[in-house]
């Protein structure tokens, strides 16, 4: 991976060697700027191994394929603005997005740092970065080290799910981190939500933007489960909760299968070996499917589920047979051969 900063501050009072119009080149230049580095990485690392981490972007830049949100400030309003920018970015066709955890400008309070760590680790890509001071957790307080570790561990366990979502995004173009209305177009309450998001097909995230830990978020219809606390929450209405630094609304969607890996120490491992399959609440007749890839992005395990009466029938294809199944709702899960 190579980080390209800048590329967007292109003056219009210049003369291009090939006679290009300086006004027309303003957006296109950033594409060429990042493409040059990306193509070099492809030559060195291979077609499917090149990764660019860029700030500037324009139409078509999603192929490079990771970007971050630029120089945000270390305060809660800027944290919320950062998410709004990411949601807009997603609706412009960009699948992978990051931001400077705890803000780039100024230095965050320990409180803000810990809240932003949870948000940052529940983004597709995560980076601690800033101006004028280091963003390592031990410079804030001991609890910051605990919080960062917990969410890093959680993200590592989520990698079978997240990498599977990344592969799906690569094939279909749906952004991994996206606004609610993309998944729930018929629910008008989702039209203007900009303080929460879907994190792939099966998870909803509502970052906390208040020092007192209060958060209000909306859940569409169905029975949802907080992945961290285990709480069951009825959808179809707004929720108001208070969370400590160790949790936030990280909700498992109804009618879904969430794979959790067996490794919380690193992001790259055998995702199918020892995977835990979390089966959420299923409506009568509802079906779900999830695919678990290997590190090359090839599907090695396919899991399908369907609610039949009082049971959820689960079918597993591929893998090495080393997996566990957990029903979040308590509904009996029957594993079919």
Label each PLM-derived region with a short phrase.
Residues 1-56, 60:
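Active-site neighborhood of glycoside hydrolase catalytic domains
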Residues 21-34, 68-88, 200:
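Acidic, His- and aromatic-enriched active-site or binding-groove loops in soluble protein domains
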Residues 331-337:
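A short amphipathic beta-strand at an alpha->beta junction
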